């Protein structure tokens, strides 16, 4: 039995299958961890969701911002933007089945025996792992609650409040929790978010750092696997922080990581999110 984690899919199914073939993935015995952003912008968002649903018993999945955007568009199609490739999912005959599965997924997963956390964007430096799991559960509970889901999805969008406070309540509380787990890149040591800067580390505003780089980050004892930040190209110097979004949908690569051995496997992608031909997966050592 092997456990793998894969970077942002964003509807790029061919590279995912290329990587799974490369490691002879067997859904009957192996496990696949997904860092979120399963859909959007790539060429096969519907097919990707259907494939994942077909192997759902082999998956651990956390939600990304594009997945939450899909759920919001499912409830209000006017949320769709011109750049989205989500309409085919909303109009699919099996849409309800796929959405019901999607909203059961987590914002943060922790594998206690391995001491590894899986999250889309990150864990803010001021939270312990325990606090992060507690607050993630608040949003996960709402996602699964038919009576509260619509209110959450309608109020999810926005950059404010940009910092956690235990005094926050209602939609504002859920929004800032969501932004930490699904949109964060740069923040201050006390967790004030900058959600405008999306490039590499050199684009950090004054006083801000990558969320994982703060020396007093309270989750340093935990290995964290995350996606979301394609501009990093998987290059993180912090020990026990694994960045897996290598920009497949932008013509980069899709990255698969063996959680136990530390091996990386990459499959190059074309500009449209399909396989770059000829497909030549590569295998790399840990932290390359």
UniProtKB/Swiss-Prot annotation:
Disulfide bonds: none
Coiled-coil ranges per UniProt: none
Catalytic activity: P(1),P(4)-bis(5'-adenosyl) tetraphosphate + H2O = 2 ADP + 2 H(+)
UniProt-listed Enzyme Commission number(s): 3.6.1.41
PANTHER family named in the record: CYTOCHROME C5, PTHR40942
Function: Hydrolyzes diadenosine 5',5'''-P1,P4-tetraphosphate to yield ADP.
Protein's name according to its UniProt entry: Bis(5'-nucleosyl)-tetraphosphatase, symmetrical
Organism field: Pseudomonas putida (strain ATCC 47054 / DSM 6125 / CFBP 8728 / NCIMB 11950 / KT2440)
Lineage, highest ranks first: Bacteria, Pseudomonadati, Pseudomonadota, Gammaproteobacteria, Pseudomonadales
Annotated gene: apaH
């Amino acid at each position: 039995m092997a456990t793998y984690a894969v970077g942002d899919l964003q509807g790029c199914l061919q590279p995912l299958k290329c990587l799974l073939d490369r490691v002879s993935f067997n859904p009957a015995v192996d496990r696949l961890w997904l860092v979120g952003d399963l859909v959007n912008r790539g060429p096969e968002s519907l097919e990707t969701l259907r494939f994942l649903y077909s192997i759902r018993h082999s998956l651990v999945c956390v939600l990304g911002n594009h997945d939450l955007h899909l759920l919001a568009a499912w409830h209000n199609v006017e949320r769709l933007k011109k750049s989205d490739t989500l309409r085919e999912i909303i109009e699919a005959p099996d849409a309800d089945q796929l959405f019901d599965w999607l909203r059961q997924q987590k914002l943060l997963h922790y594998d206690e025996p391995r001491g590894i956390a899986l999250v889309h964007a990150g864990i803010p430096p001021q939270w312990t792992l325990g606090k992060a799991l507690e607050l993630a559960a608040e949003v996960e509970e709402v996602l699964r609650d038919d009576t509260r889901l619509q209110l959450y999805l309608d109020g999810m969008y926005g950059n404010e409040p940009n910092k956690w406070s235990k005094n926050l309540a209602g939609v504002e509380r859920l929004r800032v929790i969501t932004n930490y787990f699904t949109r964060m890149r740069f923040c201050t040591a006390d967790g004030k978010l900058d959600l405008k800067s999306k490039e590499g580390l050199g684009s950090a505003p004054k006083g801000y750092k990558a969320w994982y780089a703060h020396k007093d980050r309270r989750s340093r004892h935990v290995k964290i696997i995350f996606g979301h930040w394609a501009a990093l190209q998987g290059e993180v110097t912090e020990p026990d922080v694994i960045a897996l979004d290598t920009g497949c949908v932008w013509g980069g690569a899709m990255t698969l990581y063996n959680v136990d051995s530390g091996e990386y496997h990459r499959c190059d992608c074309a500009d449209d999110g399909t396989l770059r031909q000829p497909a030549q997966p590569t295998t790399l050592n840990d932290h390359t």
